[in-house]
Amino acid sequence: GVYQFRSAADQVLYVGSAVDLKRRVRSYFTAAEKRRQVAQMLDTTVSVRHIATPTLIEARVRELRMIAELDPPVNRRSRAPRRRPWLHLAQGSGSRADPRLALTTVLPTEEVGHAVGPFASRGRGQEALRAAESVLRLGRWDGRELRRVRHDDVPAEPAEVLACLSGEVDLVTAPLLERIAALSRAERYEEAGTWTARLRCLLRAVDRAERVRPLLACPHLMAARRREVGGWELVAVRWGVLAGSMTTAPGADPRPAVELLRTSARVVDRPGRVGEVASIEETSLLADWVLDEGARIVEVDGDPAVLTWPIGAAARHRKVLASQE
């Protein structure tokens, strides 16, 4: 479930989630807890409230939602998730009629298949944009030397840009890796490091987008995981939103629970933009639960092909993704 530390003014100071609420809350009051910020919080705490949930994944999602809604002062993460930028192909306007790569915090749902992100900050988004722009050449290049990555040095066609943003990231990755190798051979290590960092920003955003796209494209998806004590955990996801969850008893037939969850789960209309109904953090959390090893897809409404990954997925470049900033 979810727990809240509250002040005398009934302000929520901190929100957390745990499998065993009693044990987790008790741990804050032991000698093992050394964090100064926690000690300060406990000095002003007058009560602890909890909300029980049928599954841990629902508790984690509720925790994210409460942090976004209540903005507790002691929680350091999950702040302002809806203001994180995406990289997409923007249509030109005014004096700039040609399409261009741009960052946006308002991404229409129908564009999620052709955008990458979200980025943790606008600065990282700009670094990823520079990496892509140096190859795709849709705008004026502001770099120096090694300007010609494309053999013809002409702007990419919009279709090629969309392909890069929707699963063929090697259109950018391959030329940039060649550039980084050339800089290293020339012993220009600082420049090679700069381009590696830019490529890493891009690949991490692509990897993040590839994880959440399947759930954002599904009007209804139900998945199941075996419980250690027996039985199943069932989760319903609609348009990237947790619509409901439940468990089944050990040895019980799970099919009635599947039917019950399908009919009792929250009704979710397709949102007009990404993040309108659920934060990307929520969708990412659900993607980790639904799509990783150990989960079984029970049912999917719509085209099941949305659950596939492109052959050229960003996860292929594990060395770049795993490298440090």
Regions found by a protein language model. Name each.
Residues G1-L13, S17-E325:
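Conserved catalytic/ligand-binding micro-motifs in nucleotide and anionic cofactor chemistry
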